[in-house]
């Protein structure tokens, strides 16, 4: 019987879209954890500039990118926003497999999970100025090169759903969260 403690980890993000910075974070965390649970945040929101892709589309992007990279020990779980911070950690816990450590750079997420007794670690940052979902979405709308910032599998999913046109239509139509 082994005395080595299992460490299962949770990473929550919107992944709009999943980019190479996210992939680097997952690679690093995967080395530190037995299993990685990836929570697809704001799962109920799509078809806005800030959140153009559905939870299912993001699930496909992430799973294909990770498998192509040889990462196999992960769970993907959509997490709907409930906008009640006092019970949010319980909500997340009810949606995902058990975990011991949370990776986040969001101050509120860090506080909520710390208060609930979880070990919280900062997510490593990789070239944040380039690997930003906002920047990648802007590049898509403006016709600039965006593909070099996402795994090939993600670009293929975006192409298959005509994601660039969707974003451009959203910008032309003025659709955004809260409109």
Model features per residue range: what roles?
Residues 1-179:
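Nucleotidyltransferase catalytic core that binds NTPs
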């Amino acid at each position: 019987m082994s005395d080595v403690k299992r460490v299962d980890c949770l990473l929550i993000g919107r992944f709009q879209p999943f980019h190479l910075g996210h992939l680097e974070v997952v690679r690093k965390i995967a080395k530190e954890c037995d299993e990685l649970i990836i929570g697809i945040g704001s799962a109920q929101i799509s078809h806005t500039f800030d959140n153009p892709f559905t939870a299912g589309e993001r699930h496909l992007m992430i799973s294909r990118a990770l498998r192509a990279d040889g990462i196999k020990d992960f769970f993907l779980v959509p997490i709907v926003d409930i906008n009640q911070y006092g019970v949010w950690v319980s909500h997340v816990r009810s949606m995902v497999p058990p975990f011991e450590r949370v990776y986040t750079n969001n101050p509120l997420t860090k506080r909520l999970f710390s208060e609930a007794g979880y070990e919280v670690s900062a997510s490593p940052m990789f070239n944040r100025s380039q690997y930003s979902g906002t920047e990648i979405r802007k590049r898509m709308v403006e016709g600039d090169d965006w593909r070099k910032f996402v795994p090939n599998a993600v670009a293929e999913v975006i192409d298959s759903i005509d994601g660039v046109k969707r974003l451009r239509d959203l910008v032309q139509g003025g659709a955004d969260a809260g409109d």
